[in-house]
Amino acid sequence: MAASVTVIGIDPGSQCTGWGIVREASGVLTLVNCGAIRPKGADFAARLGDLYRQLADVVRAHTPDEAAVEDVHAAQNVATALKLGQARGVVVAACAAHGVPVIDYRPSVIKKALVGTGRAEKEQVGYMVGQVLGVRPDWKLDTGDALAAAICHLNQRRLTRLAGLA
């Protein structure tokens, strides 16, 4: 078993992608860094390219061991769902290109792991992330969701180890 593991949690979006790096060492979770990417570009393809470049920079800077990525959930309409899916694909590609394994989590699973209900609001998730990491949440809601994904994954890893499945 590794002495520590670093996970990047990512909440993909075509307009704002939240990311958060959490490290677990000896059962203690620590916030390493977090932020939000608001891709720029003249058109959607250019924004996806910018999202890739910015996220790749984050991955290179922090060298996470694994990535926990929020899966696509129900969107307002088909066009929104397609754009979200494309942004998520860019996120997965940026991680994979840097050798970071990607684990997918449904939003309801992440929310339930942090708040106790799969229908929690973003504000509730952000509050619980702050409680778990011992910090005051002053980040964007998408960043809180990304940190929640990382925490959810680290908890899942711990449970898998305890159950003797890993």
UniProtKB/Swiss-Prot annotation:
Active site residues according to the UniProt entry: 11, 70, 142
Binding positions (Mg(2+) 2): 70
UniProt-listed Enzyme Commission number(s): 3.1.21.10
Molecular function as annotated in GO: crossover junction DNA endonuclease activity; DNA binding; magnesium ion binding
Compartments it resides in: Cytoplasm
Gene3D superfamilies for the chain: Ribonuclease H-like superfamily/Ribonuclease H
Cofactor: Mg(2+)
Classification via InterPro entries: RNaseH-like_sf, RNaseH_sf, X-over_junc_endoDNase_RuvC
One GO cellular component, as annotated: Holliday junction resolvase complex
Assigned keywords, A-Z: Cytoplasm, DNA damage, DNA recombination, DNA repair, DNA-binding, Endonuclease, Hydrolase, Magnesium, Metal-binding, Nuclease
Function: The RuvA-RuvB-RuvC complex processes Holliday junction (HJ) DNA during genetic recombination and DNA repair. Endonuclease that resolves HJ intermediates. Cleaves cruciform DNA by making single-stranded nicks across the HJ at symmetrical positions within the homologous arms, yielding a 5'-phosphate and a 3'-hydroxyl group; requires a central core of homology in the junction. The consensus cleavage sequence is 5'-(A/T)TT(C/G)-3'. Cleavage occurs on the 3'-side of the TT dinucleotide at the point of strand exchange.
Family, similarity comment: Belongs to the RuvC family.
Binding partners and assembly: Homodimer which binds Holliday junction (HJ) DNA. The HJ becomes 2-fold symmetrical on binding to RuvC with unstacked arms; it has a different conformation from HJ DNA in complex with RuvA. In the full resolvosome a probable DNA-RuvA(4)-RuvB(12)-RuvC(2) complex forms which resolves the HJ.
Protein name: Crossover junction endodeoxyribonuclease RuvC
Organism name: Nitratidesulfovibrio vulgaris (strain DP4)
Taxonomic placement: Bacteria, Pseudomonadati, Thermodesulfobacteriota, Desulfovibrionia, Desulfovibrionales
